[in-house]
Amino acid sequence: MQWIDDGLVIGLRKHGETGVVLELMTPEHGRHLGLVHGGRSRRMQPMLQPGNTLRATWRARLDGALGAYAVEPLTLNASRLMDSGLALYGVAHLSALLRLLPERDPHPALYEAAQILIAHLDDPEIAPALMVRFELALLAGLGFGLDLSHCAATGANDALVYVSPKSGRAVSASAGEPFRDRLLPLPPFLRDRDQPGSGWRTPDTQDVREGFTLTGYFLDQHVWRPRAQDTPEERARFVALGTGQS
């Protein structure tokens, strides 16, 4: 068995005296592990840092085996991101989110979103908002997507300012007003489908805080609490730095 794909480094662990088990997020083969012989050498270590993108060739005798990687550098982001505390926590949080995906389950859209996020993680003006969007996309990839397109009560697609914590669906201002204390805020930038580079406007800090409150609620309900986990420290630190709370 053999394939070649690009891969974002999201984790590694020691294996034997000189090797590592490398974990990549790839567009065509999903989250995939493989052994890198000599991965702990001085030559290989800088390449195998989380946040870097590699060209990987995976080989194994059987499809279900761990297999081995041969890797070449494509985009080495780690050295650039090391100078930013926000970026370092962002890489750690992004990697942890991607590790929630089932192994070998392709998610090409999430891979592309992760690459966009990595490219901007050291930009405090837009990285936090991009992370909120990525968390929403990850929830959808795990089967817990939110419906923010129209009001759950009226079907209208305007004046959407709340989200129901029970259904994960948007609620309009008029329909939600009597229950506002029980609803989650829907910040404007999550209703805006524009993307960076095409008229996308940077949301303000309060909007980003509300975005993290929204995604954090559903991540807690569907991901962390069922696993008996608290909010990961890397997320808490990224949110604090990204919203001016540290």
From Swiss-Prot:
InterPro entries: ARFGAP/RecO, DNA_rep/recomb_RecO_N, NA-bd_OB-fold, RecO, RecO_C
GO process annotations (BP): DNA recombination; double-strand break repair
GO cellular component: bacterial nucleoid
Pfam families on file: RecO_C, RecO_N
Keyword line: DNA damage, DNA recombination, DNA repair
Job description of the protein: Involved in DNA repair and RecF pathway recombination.
Family indicated by similarity: Belongs to the RecO family.
Protein name per the record: DNA repair protein RecO
Natural source organism: Methylorubrum extorquens (strain CM4 / NCIMB 13688)
Gene label: recO
